[in-house]
Amino acid sequence: MYKEPFQPTYEYALECDKHDELKDFQTEFYKKEGTIYLDGNSLGLLSKRAEKSLLTLLDSWKEYGIDGWTEGEHPWFFLSEKLGKLTAPLIGALPEETIVTGSTTTNIHQVIATFYEPKGIRTKILADELTFPSDIYALQSQIRLKGLDPEEHLVRVKSRDGRTLSEEDIIHAMEDDIALILLPSVLYRSGQILDMKRLTTEAHKRGIHIGFDLCHSIGSIPHHFKDWDVDFAVWCNYKYLNAGPGSVAGLYVNSKHFNRLPGLSGWFSSRKDKQFDMEHTLTAADHAGAYQIGTPHVLSTAPLIGSLEIFKDAGIERLREKSLHITRYMLNLIGHELKDFEFTIGNPLEDEKRGGHIYLEHAEAARICKALKANGVIPDFRAPNGVRLAPVALYNTYEEVWKSVQILKKIMKNEEYKQFENKREVVA
């Protein structure tokens, strides 16, 4: 259990760390001495188990050559399916509904190509104006491939406050001309969690297929897709799942849709026992593996093996419990220590609506992020005025949160941020 009630003292932070049930996992990760890493919502840290699994697959290449496809501890030919089964509990899906493949964007193209079937008056895709740009680019592209104009056929739900979305507004936008819906599970700026169960129920009442981009939720919050009856989902594995930069992504398709041919078919869409028959007629796999396209990127998949072992040991419910407590602690500390420095908290305060990161707004956000980095705290900046801070349950401590807020207070009090330009770097 985590210590209550909140106190702003250093001793309280240490006491919370003492009671942290997950504290032993911190030694699993490579943490740079003198640095407080609060950017795990953008790129998770390397774990020793992820490193080991990568080296294991390199060794299998060295040892077996071409036979690595069927030999060794993790035969490559079945690796995507194996990791899909290990990922399934994190989203509350059946093992056969989940596959590790592609990138987030290519997987969006896959699910949209599969589920977007404009007919009659149902020709539009519903998204939102706060979603990640890549999702919009892919949706626009898929609409154009149908010979339609994205300006007419892509509907984006407006935000009332520029930070969050109203679920009532989303439901109101589910009109008779909507053919498909793609929404974020957690908004990448504000960290707002959308009620996926409610939105799925409302979409299905209207005969609309609905899916979610889980990039900012998977590995951070529990999901219950089998209960919620979500149609499809996509995600990356390099944020909270700590599988490394450019790691292979994930895709979920509800088993009730396994009769659908993939919109984008390829070499690995095939049933395994038929693949090397080399026929020109595809016999698609009868599980989520059908929605793969090309050969698995084995070395970019490898770190996920070790990372998912950690998640199995830690448990997503325990991770969520700590995440809620440590983010609430950080919000309380920010409110206590930074009230004189014109910060606005941009994420929901309610536990059930808040994901795994804190979102602060400030007119000097870009230069504040640079000053934090210069002081050994790693945040990230999101245009136009956002500072994201992610105390990750697996490897961040309450002491680190306390120190980072004190450093931020010092930066503001001494105006250290003024020595930096208030514009983002090439990579924010």
Swiss-Prot record:
Keyword Hydrolase: yes
Catalytic activity of the protein: L-kynurenine + H2O = anthranilate + L-alanine + H(+); 3-hydroxy-L-kynurenine + H2O = 3-hydroxyanthranilate + L-alanine + H(+)
Superkingdom in the source lineage: Bacteria
Protein residues bound to pyridoxal 5'-phosphate: T104, T105, F132, P133, S134, D135, D213, H216, Y238, W267, T295
Keywords from the UniProt entry: Hydrolase, Pyridine nucleotide biosynthesis, Pyridoxal phosphate
The protein's required cofactors: pyridoxal 5'-phosphate
Entry keyword annotation includes Hydrolase: yes
Residues annotated with N6-(pyridoxal phosphate)lysine modification: K239
Coiled coil location: none
GO biological process terms, semicolon-separated: anthranilate metabolic process; L-kynurenine catabolic process; L-tryptophan catabolic process to kynurenine; NAD biosynthetic process; quinolinate biosynthetic process
Pathway(s) annotated for this protein in UniProt: Amino-acid degradation; L-kynurenine degradation; L-alanine and anthranilate from L-kynurenine: step 1/1; Cofactor biosynthesis; NAD(+) biosynthesis; quinolinate from L-kynurenine: step 2/3
Enzyme class, spelled out: hydrolase
Gene3D superfamilies, A to Z: Aspartate Aminotransferase, domain 1 (3.90.1150.10), Type I PLP-dependent aspartate aminotransferase-like (Major domain) (3.40.640.10)
GO terms assigned for molecular function: kynureninase activity; pyridoxal phosphate binding
GO cellular component terms listed in the entry, alphabetical order: cytoplasm
EC annotation from Swiss-Prot or TrEMBL: 3.7.1.3
Family: Belongs to the kynureninase family.
Self-association state and partner proteins as the record states: Homodimer.
Function: Catalyzes the cleavage of L-kynurenine (L-Kyn) and L-3-hydroxykynurenine (L-3OHKyn) into anthranilic acid (AA) and 3-hydroxyanthranilic acid (3-OHAA), respectively.
The protein, known as: Kynureninase
UniProt organism field: Bacillus cereus (strain ATCC 14579 / DSM 31 / CCUG 7414 / JCM 2152 / NBRC 15305 / NCIMB 9373 / NCTC 2599 / NRRL B-3711)
